[in-house]
Amino acid sequence: MLTIVNGVTSKQVLANEIINLLETMGLDGYFYLGYPVLGGIDGKIKVDALLVSEQTGIVLFDLETLAEENMEDKIQLLDELYNNMEAKLKRYGYLSKRRVLQVPINVLSYAPLYKTKSDEICTSIEEVKEYLESLEWKQGEEYYKKLLE
């Protein structure tokens, strides 16, 4: 069962599309919307949405409501989200095995107005579904409960 934890977001339409998709996929876990924050070097970084699931691990969502701008900037944002989440999780030794983090971190941007897509930039909800279906957390059974602690 998926538990949805709603915060405040200005991107509710895109968030609802993701929520509807996740509910049809039968994932177990938590979907946090509108308030997950990561600490970065330059201050706090807001994450539009965060999925924590035994099947997928962690998925950080960037919900983009604007038309395509600079792809390099978007990729840099996704890298920054990944790096900050990795740094946060590595503080918890019980999530690693021999210095290797056992929780997969995935980032994607759902940007339906973009014309250009990439591995991490999905321009349709179908692409988001394909991306999520491609994820597998082999150590999920062992580390999922630890992740929620």
Language-model segments: residues:
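Intrinsically disordered, low-complexity Ser/Thr/Pro/Gly-rich regulatory segments
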Residues: 1-47, 51-149
